[in-house]
Amino acid sequence: MSFVACTLEQKIMYKPTDYEYQQLSFINFNASCGMQLDCENEWFKRANQLPWQAWEVLYAALFPSGIGNVAKPCRMVLGALIIQLRMGFSDRDLVSQVQENPYYQYFIGLETFQHVPPFAPTLLVEWRKRVTMEFVIKANDALCNAMPKLRKPKMRFGSTGTGVLVATQICDATVAPQNIRFPQDTSLLNEARLKLEKIIDWFCRRYGFPKPRTYRKIAHKEYLAFAKSKKPSRVCIRNAIRQQLGYVRRNLQYLDAFMQDGYAPDKKFINSIVTVHILYAQQKYMYENNTHQVEHRIVSISQPYVRPIVRGKASKPTEFGAKLHLSIDERGFARIEHLSFDAYNEGALLQNALEAYRYRNHHYPKRVLVDQIYRTQDNIRFCTKNNIRISGPKLGRPSTDKEANRQSAKTMAKDRADRIEIERYFSIAKRRNGMGLISKKRKDTSLSTIALSVMVTNIFGSFQSAVSEYEEKKSKTTRNR
């Protein structure tokens, strides 16, 4: 069976799925194999609990056109992306696993088990382009609205001994590292030189020019001599940068001369030429001013949107990827407050996060658990004005009342213990749900993958726990009757 992946430029129509149909019972779903499958399987349970209809409404709004090829159903698209992030499959591995696994086929909404792949690996790229970060954030909100509202939940970080939830919001930021080579000035300039040489060769073949003098063999030999040195001195590094800057400048002059004469490059080379121009200007500025800092510094030619994010941690003082500002409410459900590849101060976003909490719940939280970077005077003043207790010590001199100091220390200890929940969330999202290393090559698909990772962590975390508690309480009530 052949598959054709439709590009986003083509007109695609969508037919909303009729969720009134009854999917075959899971016992008979794989009857062709002559065996019965486990109804307690994790994927079967999640398939019957997720808000597919709410997601269907959001997904159908992405298709304004009523003509064209019919797109795949929403449940197949989101289900496949959820499986991929949860299990860590590549695109080809995902298709083969779905083809072999009846549990996965049930999860993505197939009516019966089939031996034919339900979609092609190339379609996953188009799905990730279509399922944008904004769409995933809305789908994540729909997932939160579908969570059962428990009156007396089990003990969580936001609950008290009486089983009553305290309106709580935890805020923190982390970086989702991008899968790029560790950037060095010499390696970036050498990569830029190689790309420019490739483009120059294309110009010469395409328009019949004689090859200009690029000194590529000498440049390659000089770079290898530098790269083989284990601990190059500062003087050696500057000499290597100066040499590579000269070769890059020469190649850029050749390309600029070609284009000024009216010869156009191939479409696939335009972004590389623009990126190398910016990279050369940045590296030249840092070399001439003897500095290592420049605004909007490029650390990857293939992914020029990636920026260095200074974290100040012992293991990773600088990370390269998108910075994620996350908030978790008292039920353990996480939401993305801000997501960007540019560096920013998360402390300035606390008030926006509190206003978003108020918009969703019609009231401010009783307490907000944050680290030291959020405790600015503006944020403390805002929290005091709106009767929000912000974690951390009070400003001013300590009280002379020993009992008050004892209670304050006890409250601070509980706040520190409860704030660990967001660190735990980051750990699960990075180790288990695909946020540990983003391997997508496009900016939009990288952001949507990070947002999907947050939603998947909610599905198999807080949402799963809330549904399990609800079903447990419901079964106890039924038995008592």
Q: Where in this protein do the model-derived segments appear?
A:
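Helix-centered, glycine/charged polyanion-binding patches within enzymatic domains
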Residues: 372-443
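Flexible, glycine/threonine-enriched loop-and-boundary segments that flank and lead into catalytic domains
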Residues: 301-315
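Active-site- or DNA-interface-adjacent structural scaffold in DNA-acting proteins
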Residues: 111, 115-303
